[in-house]
A protein has these predicted regions:
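Cytoplasmic-entry segments and transmembrane alpha-helices of multi-pass inner-membrane transporters
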Residues: 16-18, 105-139, 143, 201-202, ...
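Transmembrane alpha-helices
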Residues: 20, 123, 127, 179, ...
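Transmembrane alpha-helix signature in integral membrane proteins
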Residues: 78-112
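N-terminal signal-anchor/first transmembrane alpha helix
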Residues: 1-39, 109, 119, 123
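Interhelical loop and adjacent transmembrane-helix boundary motif
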Residues: 8-14, 57-59, 72-75, 79, ...
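C-terminal transmembrane helix and the adjacent membrane-cytosol boundary/short C-terminal tail
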Residues: 5-7, 190-205, 272-299
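Membrane-interfacial helix termini and adjacent extracytoplasmic/periplasmic loops
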Residues: 55, 60, 137-178, 212, ...
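Short membrane-interfacial helix/loop motifs at transmembrane-helix boundaries
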Residues: 30-79, 147, 250-251, 299
Length: 299
């Protein structure tokens, strides 16, 4: 009898431990997304909350559904939102490519270093996370301004005669995003390259393969999972970035994060803003599905 109670308690405890993460995902991920989608099917009104209910009781004690897809139709018809989405995808894709081109050699070089130097370089990579994200962005504003460090050095060296307009440009946005998310590219690449079997490259060298050929045929294909993981970790947050385009790009930098903020807090059009957020979420799911498909093919 006691043994049966113990087995029952063990199963209950195991189910509780396993189910806790799923409960967390449901409460803090699926439920909020459900509320956002629900609001996107409503109409904006002046009131609190600033949207219409999705159903109401009629005089005949029946539920009347009041959903509408006008917000989604408006997104597809209005050019402003398409420009925001396309510009966000462009900025995120180019920033991800730059992070990959810069981060891969850095990650590869770190794996070739000795123990103490390797630890020191990894510390330098994660060191920016110890400071506030906003402080780092404000620091770049000071460096890129007309009288900032970069323009001052260029003027004193005689390379330019007039200060360059670096702040509030697309270049400043790319610099800020690459600087912020570069560690998210380097760390998964380093973890992948650190686990590679050096015997394979040594065997290729013994067979007469040149180093660059061994890299293209062995190291690069084996590091594909790290490349994909790093690209996802950079592309997904960069796509919805709001702070960097606003502070470094100014008002002319139109990205979907800024559009979403304006609809929520300035226009107070919560249904339209929820539709913008829902469509953005669908766009973010696409690279994740591609990565999952790749993992299934690999296994």
């Amino acid at each position: 009898m006691n043994e049966n109670k113990y087995i029952h308690f063990e199963r209950l405890w195991r189910g509780l431990v396993i189910g806790t993460p799923y409960l967390w995902l449901v409460l803090f991920f699926l439920v909020p997304i459900g509320f956002v989608f629900k609001i996107s099917l409503a109409d904006p009104i002046i009131g609190q909350p600033p949207f219409t209910p999705l159903w109401e009781w009629t005089d005949s004690a029946r539920i009347s559904i009041l959903t509408t897809f006008d917000n989604y139709r408006f997104l597809f018809m209005e050019e402003l939102y398409w420009i925001s989405y396309l510009n966000s995808v462009k900025v995120a894709a180019i920033s991800t490519l730059i992070c990959l081109l810069v981060g891969y050699p850095m990650a590869y070089g770190i794996t070739r270093c000795s123990g103490n130097i390797k630890s020191f370089l990894l510390l330098l990579i994660v060191l920016p996370f110890w400071t506030s994200f906003l402080l780092r962005v404000y620091a770049w504003m000071g460096m890129l301004s007309t009288h900032g460090v970069i323009n001052t050095l260029l003027l004193n060296s005689g390379l330019i005669e007039q200060p360059l307009k670096l702040l509030y440009t697309d270049l400043a946005v790319y610099v800020g995003i690459v600087y912020t998310y570069l560690p998210f590219m380097i760390l998964p690449l380093y973890a992948n390259l650190e686990r590679r079997d050096l015997v394979l490259t040594e065997a290729a060298a013994d067979l007469g393969s040149r180093p660059w050929r061994a890299f293209l045929d062995i190291t690069l294909p084996l590091s594909t999972p790290g490349i994909i993981a790093g690209c996802l970790l950079v592309f997904i947050p960069a796509l919805g970035e709001f702070v960097i385009p606003t502070l470094l790009g100014g008002l002319d930098s139109l990205m979907i994060g800024r559009t979403l903020f304006d609809e929520f807090f300035q226009n107070r059009d919560w249904p339209l803003a929820s539709a913008v957020a829902t469509l953005l979420l669908l766009i973010l799911i696409i690279p994740i599905m591609i990565f999952q498909k790749y993992r299934e093919q690999e296994t």
